[in-house]
Amino acid sequence: MSHNTFGHLFRVTTWGESHGAALGCVIDGCPPGIAFTLTEIQAYLNKRRPGHSEYTTQRRELDQVEILSGVVSQNDGKALVTTGTPISMFIRNVDHHSEDYNAIMHKYRPGHADYTYDVKYGIRDHRGGGRASARETVVRVAAGALARKIVPGLIVRGAVTAIGPHNIDRDRWDWSEVDKNPFFSPDAQAACVFANYISQLCKTGSSVGAIVEIVAENVPAGLGAPVYAKLDQDIASFLMSINAVKGIEIGDGFAAAHLTGEENADEMRMGSDGKPVFLSNHAGGILGGISNGQPIVARFAVKPTSSILTPSRSIDIEGNDVNVMTKGRHDPCVGIRAVPVGEAMVACAIADHYLRHRGQVGCI
């Protein structure tokens, strides 16, 4: 299986399976001299970590990152500094129940990659989905923590804006609320609605989808290039690679199709500091594939978790009609824990383009 690497200059290769001994990544192209601590990386991993909320999977993983190469310790014994050589990180799996999947070893679970992996490779890891599991994204979050350090002042934040039929009220958007509830909701009232909805859903053994919004601030203007190296092109590609993601939009996205040219135009004026000021941000911070200095806004839709307790019709590897009921521990809404993953992928895309721009044009 190839295609386990993303990025051009800031290149991340991930490895490992859901029920293997560990998952890891190798980061190649990270500049030397980037200082960080394991505590900083762990903070992002903890946002994604399973088993600490009744609204996510009860698989309990510590998700403690270990670094094997590419850094040296500072005198304080806590801070690490990148050396410019490949950085290898891994996270051990400690709580997988592979026996839960014995009953579906020879059956294809609807909505999963079981059938397509089998068709392509002639073999698949039935234990938790193997490489197709969302468990793979844990090391992307670790890589994203480093990516944030590359672009000076970069802030990347994410939030859940909808779960199933329930949406947040954007007039109540408050970033300070995101870390106060298990749904990463910027709307405290919506978080209560999400809680009641997911609680009822869990009783039926079903699942539901979600919409996640990522906002990147302090992105310098000029990142990205026409025509086949657009910044929004890579952001969309990186986000689309996340498990269960089925749709992407940048800025107003599909809503822009319902606007007039006058409504959609991000008009400009010269600010008092001599720099241009945009009067709106329908484009989501990117024009012609190049960042314009405004916040970059991206949204992605996450489908309902395919593993549910409701029996589903399918076939087995011999072509027989069967019914499938997936046991194991699964997220009723996998979109919730996709928030830190989306943040990481956007951070990696921006860091990659920052280095590419610096290499082509010089200092930013």
Curated annotation (Swiss-Prot):
Swiss-Prot/TrEMBL cofactor(s): FMNH2
Cofactor remark: Reduced FMN (FMNH(2)).
Gene Ontology MF: a single term: FMN binding
Pathway field: Metabolic intermediate biosynthesis; chorismate biosynthesis; chorismate from D-erythrose 4-phosphate and phosphoenolpyruvate: step 7/7
GO biological process: amino acid biosynthetic process; aromatic amino acid family biosynthetic process; chorismate biosynthetic process
Record carries keyword Signal: no
InterPro entries hit by this protein: Chorismate_synth (IPR000453), Chorismate_synth_AroC_sf (IPR035904), Chorismate_synthase_CS (IPR020541)
Binding-site list for NADP(+): 48
Xref: CDD domains: Chorismate_synthase (cd07304)
Entry keywords, A to Z: Amino-acid biosynthesis, Aromatic amino acid biosynthesis, FAD, Flavoprotein, FMN, Lyase, NADP
UniProt xrefs under SUPFAM superfamilies: Chorismate synthase, AroC
Gene3D superfamilies in UniProt: Chorismate synthase AroC
Reaction(s) the record says it catalyses: 5-O-(1-carboxyvinyl)-3-phosphoshikimate = chorismate + phosphate
Superkingdom: Bacteria
Enzyme class, first EC level, given as a word: lyase
Binding site for FMN: 131-133, 243-244, 288, 303-307, 329
Complex and partners: Homotetramer.
Physiological role: This reaction introduces a second double bond into the aromatic ring system.
NCBIfam families xref list: aroC, PRK05382.1
Name of the protein in question: Chorismate synthase
Organism: Bartonella bacilliformis (strain ATCC 35685 / KC583 / Herrer 020/F12,63)
Gene name of the record: aroC
